[in-house]
């Protein structure tokens, strides 16, 4: 591992490149003091000048309460530090035994004089992309704050081809679309009624998409926008300004619409951009793993990959059901007596069916069998805002946990 000395630089604009020179990241402040970055790959612009910052909520839980102000502009560069890092580490499991973590870093320490608040924006630039995050040191003027929205922009250089699914706080069960960026709005509008009729989907914007977002440019660059090290912070979606082709972060809110209750010191997740002229690098690049926090589990001997089959896909395709009976319009945990109900004949998680899967797993070298729909409550579990849906311990009458567990172990299956 090598770490170079930190070099303080009192400048408002600074450039850092990847160790191999392919990726260039430039930071600057606008005339209004708003943080801005841009990015290029092998001399081709990947991200046009894009704004950075956070809007904070006027909230009684914040240190400044209803007098809260934003972290969007009015900044001055207090210090800039650069460094190089190079190490090789071993993941618990993965495609490779070792992973090289090699990057050049630039940390821009900002101060907002009107509020006397400090914020650092840290950039790490790799061979195939970069990551950026916001860092908030503990300080009297920024001890507790509530996020209204994070405004991290990704300004695209053209009407790229996008591989995307609609933005949704709860599910990813959509069909992937392949359209130009300007086609996202049209597809969501066309399918909005079908989205409304599916109680598992809730599209939050006319141009919102989920990460990771895969893009391809007209001149053959592959770009992926995602995040890493998402801890104690909402997950990030992207909302597109399709007139200007600018994506902006859109955080998942809580029940009252707030998007983060922060106690400093605190670091946000990394916002990542992968880029290459070879599509295979989107999968082989280890940038996300390198930016994730190191594993904190001391004994990892119990963690291992496995192969399994399961009783669930036949419910998805409609040949079996999760529910045990069709007799009742609704059920109540602890009150409904399933032994008095007539089986519907399509229940998937039965003793007979699960034994069939166990036999298949044992014969074909699969280590485990996954079973859904074995416990009481599946008759009206979805789409009703029901409080008590499952108790997760009481099986249906046609599912014997003890006997099936013993049978599986006798076959060497879990």
Regions inferred by a protein language model and the residue ranges of each:
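Conserved mixed alpha/beta catalytic, RNA-binding, or beta-rich assembly cores of soluble enzyme
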Residues: 282-285, 294-300, 313-324
């Amino acid at each position: 591992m090598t770490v170079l000395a930190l070099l303080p630089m009192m400048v408002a604009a600074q450039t850092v490149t990847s160790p191999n020179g392919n990726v260039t990241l430039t930071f600057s402040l606008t005339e209004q003091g708003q943080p801005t970055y841009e990015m290029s790959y092998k001399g081709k612009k990947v991200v046009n000048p894009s704004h950075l910052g956070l809007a904070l909520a006027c909230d009684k839980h914040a240190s400044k309460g209803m007098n809260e102000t934003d972290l969007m502009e009015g900044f001055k560069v207090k210090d800039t530090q650069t460094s190089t890092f190079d190490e090789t580490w071993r993941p618990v499991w993965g495609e490779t035994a070792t992973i090289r973590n090699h990057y050049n870093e630039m940390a821009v320490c900002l101060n907002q004089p009107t509020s006397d608040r400090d914020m650092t924006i840290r950039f790490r630039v790799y061979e195939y992309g970069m990551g950026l995050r916001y860092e908030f040191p503990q300080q009297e003027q920024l001890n507790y704050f509530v996020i209204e929205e994070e405004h991290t922009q990704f300004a695209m250089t053209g009407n790229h081809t996008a591989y995307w699914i609609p933005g949704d706080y709860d599910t990813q069960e959509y069909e992937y679309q392949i359209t130009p960026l300007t086609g996202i709005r049209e597809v969501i509008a066309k399918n909005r009624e079908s989205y409304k009729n599916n109680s598992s989907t809730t599209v939050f914007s006319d141009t919102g998409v989920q990460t990771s977002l895969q893009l391809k440019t007209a001149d053959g660059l592959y770009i992926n926008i995602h995040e890493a090290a998402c801890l104690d912070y909402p997950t990030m979606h992207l909302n597109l300004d399709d007139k200007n082709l600018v994506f902006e972060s859109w955080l998942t809110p809580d029940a009252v619409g707030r998007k983060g209750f922060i106690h400093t010191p605190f670091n946000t997740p990394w916002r990542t951009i992968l880029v290459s002229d070879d599509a295979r690098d989107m999968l082989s690049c280890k940038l996300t793993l390198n930016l994730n926090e190191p594993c904190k589990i001391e004994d990892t001997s119990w963690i291992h990959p496995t192969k399994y089959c399961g009783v669930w896909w036949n419910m998805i395709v409609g040949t079996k059901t999760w529910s045990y009976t069709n007799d009742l319009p609704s059920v109540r945990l602890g009150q409904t007596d399933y032994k008095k109900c007539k089986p519907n004949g399509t229940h998937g998680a039965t003793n007979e069916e699960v034994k069939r899967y166990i036999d298949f797993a044992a014969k074909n070298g699969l280590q485990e069998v996954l079973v859904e729909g074995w416990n009481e409550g599946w008759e009206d579990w979805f789409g009703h805002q029901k409080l008590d849906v499952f108790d997760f311990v009481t099986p249906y009458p046609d599912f014997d946990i003890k006997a099936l567990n013993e049978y599986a172990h006798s076959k060497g299956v879990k």
